[in-house]
Each structure stands twice: as C-alpha cells, then as structure tokens.
C-alpha cells in the first residue's frame, strides 16, 4: 500500500508538493471533476463515501519514519469537509496529527460552514491556509454543475469569517466556466483573500468557446492591480501574451512572491488554438 501523504503528479503538482486524500469518493458529484476521467473513479460509488481504511494509523506510521517539511494539501480526490465527514469527523483527526508534527497544511473545500467546526485547530497551526473553489455565483448554475457542493455565496462568506479570525485564505479559480463570473468572484472576494490560483477548463466540454488569452491576460492584470499573490496554471499561461518571470512564484510554500510582470509583443508569442 502507498503512503497516505503522497507526491502528486502532473498538473496536480502545481497546487502542492504533497497531498493527502481522506475519503474514497466525493459526494459533490461536480460535472467537471477531473477525477471522473480516471480509471479509479469507476471503482468508487458516490452514493457511499467511505474513509480510507486505517488512515489514521497509517498516517501516524508514515510520519514517524518520514519527515515532511513542505505543504500537504487536503485533498485532491474528494473534499475534506464533504457531507460524509459530518459523520466520521476524520478531517479533524487528521488535522490533529498534522498539527502535532507541525506540518504546513493547505485545505481546499466546497464544504462551506462545515469548515468552521475546526477553526480552533486552524488557529494552532504555524502554517495553514484554507481555500475554496469558486466557479459560479448563480445558484441554479451551481446546482447544475456542483449538485452536492455548498452554494458559492456560503463558501465566500466562510472565507471572510476565516480571514477575520486571522487565518490565511485562498481561492482556486479552476475550472473557469464563465470568465465574467470569475471576474465578479474576484471583485467580491479580494478584500479577504490572500492568494489566488487560476486555471481554465480542461476536462469538461462547454457548449461555447472561451477566449483563454483574453481571460488570462485580463485576470492577471487585475490581480497585479490588487497587489494579490497569485499563481497562473501552466495550461492557462500558455495562451497568454502577458509575460511573467519564471521565478515570480514559489509554488511549494504558503506565501507567494509578488509577481514581476512585463508585456511582450503579441507576435513574439505563439498562442495555442482554443480547445472548444
């Protein structure tokens, strides 16, 4: 059996040097979820989400023999504050172990107010950041694309509460379903968000085209204007005519460096055709 804390591969590596998945499956059932493209997904029932077997014991065993000083993300597969966690409360137990070993921790969740259950633990960490994926604002659209997730405005509200409590906050703008909505989400959230990670749509076929070059350039310029820490994922960056220095970000640490930006002429950058 593999370690509970593992090194993510491929595109996931842009989010964190380490990750930890608590449950098998996810009850959010998001239409765009990349996990649905994996063979693993076919073996998991979203109707019966179960904890990984003996996860607490295995985590303790791993941390006794392996020193981990870099960020661990909860979670890439599934949500640490899914509805199932209200029964098992395993995320809280996992956090207690990570806290004891002083491991830098990041959380990404669409669990809304369920996250606040562990606010007392968050405050004890030396390095922790709590984030949410924000894709839409309209409730009907959210229920269509993310039928099991907490509605976006509740996620935004909780991030504001966490910020007021002194917790570092972040947002994942990935996937991007409607660029105009993503711009709105940025304007709503930036007063209480410390950092953003921005991607595109990769695994779900939208019924319309998106100008990824325009979106990437526009949101990056606005993030710079707002003096926000951010990371533009490689899948989006390759479309952009806005050139960022290679070393403007340290993706393995909780504090992103300030971007240094310069514009390069359109004709000097070969843009990929849109995928849709």
Task: For the regions a language model picked out, list residue spans one by one.
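Auxiliary Fe-S-binding modules of radical SAM enzymes
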Residues: 1-11, 166, 176-276
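N-terminal [4Fe-4S]-dependent radical SAM core
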Residues: 1-71
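Conserved AdoMet/S-adenosylmethionine-binding subsite of the radical SAM
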Residues: 54-226
């Amino acid at each position: 059996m593999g370690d509970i804390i593992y090194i993510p591969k491929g595109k996931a590596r842009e989010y964190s040097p380490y990750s930890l998945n608590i449950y098998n499956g996810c009850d959010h059932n998001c239409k765009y979820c990349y996990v649905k493209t994996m063979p693993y997904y076919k073996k998991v029932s979203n109707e019966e989400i179960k904890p990984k077997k003996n996860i607490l014991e295995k985590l303790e065993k791993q941390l006794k023999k392996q020193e981990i000083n870099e960020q661990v993300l909860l979670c890439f597969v599934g949500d640490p504050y899914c509805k199932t966690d209200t029964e098992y409360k395993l995320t809280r137990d996992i956090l207690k172990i990570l806290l004891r070993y002083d491991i830098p921790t990041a959380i990404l969740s669409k669990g809304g107010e369920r996250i606040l259950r562990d606010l007392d633990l968050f405050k004890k960490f030396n390095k922790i950041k709590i984030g949410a994926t924000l894709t839409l604002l309209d409730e009907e659209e959210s229920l269509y694309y993310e039928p099991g997730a907490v509605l976006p405005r509740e996620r935004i509200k909780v991030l504001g509460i966490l910020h007021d409590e002194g917790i570092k906050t972040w947002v994942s703008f990935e996937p991007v379903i409607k660029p105009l909505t993503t711009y709105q989400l940025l304007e709503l959230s930036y007063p209480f968000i410390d950092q953003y990670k921005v991607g595109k749509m990769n695994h779900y076929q939208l019924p319309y085209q998106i100008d990824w070059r325009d979106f990437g350039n526009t949101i990056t310029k606005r993030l710079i204007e707002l003096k926000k820490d951010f990371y533009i994922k490689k899948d989006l960056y390759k479309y952009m005519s806005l050139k960022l220095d290679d070393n403007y970000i340290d993706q393995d640490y909780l504090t992103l460096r300030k971007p240094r930006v310069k514009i390069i002429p359109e004709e000097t950058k070969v843009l990929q055709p849109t995928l849709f």
